[in-house]
Amino acid sequence: MRRNVYLWLIAVAASLLMACEKGNQGPVGPDPSTIVDGMPKSAKRGVAFSFTNMLDLPLLSPYISWDYNWGNTPTDDAALWFDSNEMDYCPMCWNGNYNADKIRAFVAAHPNTQYLLAFNEPNLTDQAHMTPREAAALWQPLVDLAKELNLKLVSPAMNYGTLPGYSDPIKWLDEFFALPEVDPNDIYAISIHCYMSSASAVQGYIERFEKYGKPIWLTEFCAWDPVPGSVSTQMDYMCTVLHDLETRPSVERYAWFIPRSGSKVDSPPYMQLITHDYPPALTDLGRIYCLLSPMNSKLWLRANRPVYASEYCALKNNALSLRPTTDEEVRNRIGKDGLQVANFSQGQELTYRLYLQEKASTVELRYCGYSNSICEVLVDGQTACHVEMPRTGGSDNWTAAHQALSMDAGAHTITLRLFSGSCSLSAFQVK
């Protein structure tokens, strides 16, 4: 009996020693594969664009996941770039005059192709221009092609229309789905277009299509009706709408219209993402589209650098204005481009997921503004400290405010809640 007790004590001591050795290796935390130095690009975000200038692709491909160009195939050079840069190209049958053999050849050469897009705006007289019955008469060959190539079929892309009797896209789709030639089960997702300039109107428009119980693809959108008065208005629209699209479960994909058009970048409706220069560059609007947070709530940012204010995983109010940062000190410290929060106002909350390798004792906020402000810092939902931020006297007069706090090593959520005042916020760091 004594021998058994003795052996048991040895086993317990050994297990405790092993636990201590493990503890010395660092904080116990989440799966290491979920700890990242920067958030990956959004799986939802894409563009509606024909990449004929190969200089455009390196600008957008690090930040977007898919593209379509209203055609059956992209250019050969673009297709190769997509394959090597984690971008998905979606062939489209714009109307009934598509080339099935070209689509077959493309899918054979690019077997990772997943989707086939159907007719473009059939209820517009200057687009595919089809009644539901006319579209249904052309539907079965499209279904057969998708099944042959093992592609998921996306519905005709709907918008408010000009076809007599079918200005309402819901009416067109309801009639289309009710026809005997059409089996709704053959359709994987619902494609829609929207150019309303009100973010709340866009949200309400999306909700109308949720009744079909299928993933929604917003395959063309920007603020255009009414035409925005400035690029700043387009930027604010983009921020609010993208925050909703990234967090709305029913939306699986979205594509901005359009990265570059034939008009000047600084002309209405101010929606271009890429300049007309040689070589081209991202416009400020393009930088926002590329860098806006994917709102990832599963990954943890490694807290070994300042965190851009825009790297949040959640926020209280979607109407948050972001702009390319003008805080050169932060950009140099982080080593990459980023966005600043231009309207951090009282009551707004920004939440981040951070992983600390070591215990932290200080929080630093980089800010500027015309009023005195106080920011409440919450760690894992509990108030850790309040940071006083005296006014800096200018919109680009960046400075740092510091406050002591205590954070153990490991994974934490940090929420910045503006308790009073208003300011611009470029970044923060716990150290």
State the predicted function of each range.
Residues 110-132, 153-163, 185-194, 252-260:
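Active-site groove signature of glycoside hydrolases
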Residues 1-18:
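Sec-dependent bacterial lipoprotein signal peptides
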Residues 69, 91, 120, 170-208, ...:
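Aromatic- and acid-rich polysaccharide-binding/catalytic face
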Residues 161-164, 211-238, 257-275:
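Active-site clefts of carbohydrate-active enzymes
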Residues 90, 248, 257-306:
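Aromatic-rich peripheral "rim/lid" segments of glycoside hydrolase catalytic domains that contact
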Residues 297-431:
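Extracytoplasmic
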Residues 44-114:
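N-terminal carbohydrate-binding/catalytic regions of secreted carbohydrate-active enzymes
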Residues 16-39:
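Bacterial Sec-dependent N-terminal signal peptides
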